[in-house]
Amino acid sequence: MSLATDCPSSLASASERPLLSQVQLARAAAQHTATLPTAIKNAALEAMATALLEHQEPILAANRADLERAAEMVKAGELSASAYARLKLDAHKLADMVAGVRQVIRLGDPVGRALLIRELDEGLILERRTYPLGVLGVIFESRPDALVQIAALAVKTGNSVLLKGGSEALLSCQALMAAIQAGLQQIPEFPQGSLQLLTSRAEVKALLQLEGLVDLIIPRGSSSFVRYILENTRIPVLGHADGLCHLYVDRAADVDMAIKLTVDSKTQYPAACNAIETLLVHKAIAPHFLPLAVKALREKGVELRGDPLCRELVPDLIPATEDDWSTEYADLILSIKVVGSLDEAIAHIQQYGSRHTEAIVTEDAAAARRFLDEVDAAGVFHNASTRFADGFRYGFGAEVGISTQKLPPRGPVGLEGLVTYRYQLRGQGHLVADYTGPQARPFQHRDRLNNTGLA
């Protein structure tokens, strides 16, 4: 039966039929890539990496054209400065993208792994093995580098993916996809149709309605953008709506370390979802720490907003409002609050945080342990910048996004988050009837997989 026949009639409107054809091609490709040998997938990834380097000039030229158009959008108020910053590519960023692809090559293949091997009875063996999800729909704003990260992870995990970047990144995405496709064409065993680029909002709207045909939607972008996706599809969604991160400077913090971590967590890349938006400072260390931190942050061009206790110590801070505690600036703006205790810091984070990434700076091991154990977030750090919350930095090779939901996968989602599992049962004519009733044969339930994952 064809996919178009399986699809509800309401989804098969004339405007959606071209997309259905693309999804059909993607599903057919996914059946093939699901069983590709690791060597073929790695060869495809190396071909992608090589092609990206060979196509550097047209990629950067396309990006410059996007930036020119995006600059006018910023002037017109149609695009934020942070989105403009995420759009920019250069030779260094392209080299990082290629390094990310090659790191994925070095990672183990997540497909076909045995998670469980159990002998239910003699000759009756149950296995739980990893398998690709199938067809992914990934929609992202700005950040054309996301296209390369996602494509690499899709290839390694044997998934097909339909990618849609923001209109402001259209030319960049087209140039990147052209390079990737040129590379994949060098690997005859790799099926066409596994990586596809969508280019219109109408396609996104139609994609969100393809429940049963698309297995997972992954949005990457602003909180309003992610909320739109969540509210307009019944397909499972993996992602986060906000990146409202905090750094708490404890009373026992090393001041020099705390200043460096504050500056790095805010200014290293302020448009990133793992940059801090609020700095919490214990009242015992605030008189010493705050003036120094304010000076260091202002040298980086950060606009600072403080609560009344902060402004007693640094009077020229902009007064912080209630809205500031729940705002993801994604810009060189930081709110600062003085707290009376670790308990108050944790309570503030639990009330206003987005469960993305939270950090404490302290030399008190007990305070650090409490913070790590009690703060509910996908990433909880001690004496480390929140900017480490990233799939590449975690050694995942790349990430398709960061999930703040409680159910797994959580945090930066790399290879392991793009596979599911199947139960495979091998018997020798075993019947359930033999295991029921007064003369029931007992199960043995002997595990054959040790703690290392080896049989």
From Swiss-Prot:
GO terms for cellular component: cytoplasm. One of its GO terms (biological process) is L-proline biosynthetic process. Its EC number is 1.2.1.41. It is found in: Cytoplasm. PROSITE patterns: PROA. InterPro entries: Ald_DH/histidinol_DH, Ald_DH_C, Ald_DH_N, Aldehyde_DH_dom, G-glutamylP_reductase_CS, Glu-5-SA_DH, GPR_dom. Keywords: Amino-acid biosynthesis, Cytoplasm, NADP, Oxidoreductase, Proline biosynthesis. Pathway: Amino-acid biosynthesis; L-proline biosynthesis; L-glutamate 5-semialdehyde from L-glutamate: step 2/2. SUPFAM superfamilies: ALDH-like (SSF53720). GO terms for molecular function: glutamate-5-semialdehyde dehydrogenase activity; NADP binding. It is an enzyme of class 1 (oxidoreductase). It catalyses: L-glutamate 5-semialdehyde + phosphate + NADP(+) = L-glutamyl 5-phosphate + NADPH + H(+). Pfam families: Aldedh. It comes from the Bacteria. Belongs to the gamma-glutamyl phosphate reductase family. Catalyzes the NADPH-dependent reduction of L-glutamate 5-phosphate into L-glutamate 5-semialdehyde and phosphate. The product spontaneously undergoes cyclization to form 1-pyrroline-5-carboxylate. This is Gamma-glutamyl phosphate reductase. It comes from Synechococcus sp. (strain JA-2-3B'a(2-13)) (Cyanobacteria bacterium Yellowstone B-Prime). The lineage of its organism: Bacteria, Bacillati, Cyanobacteriota, Cyanophyceae, Synechococcales. The gene is proA.
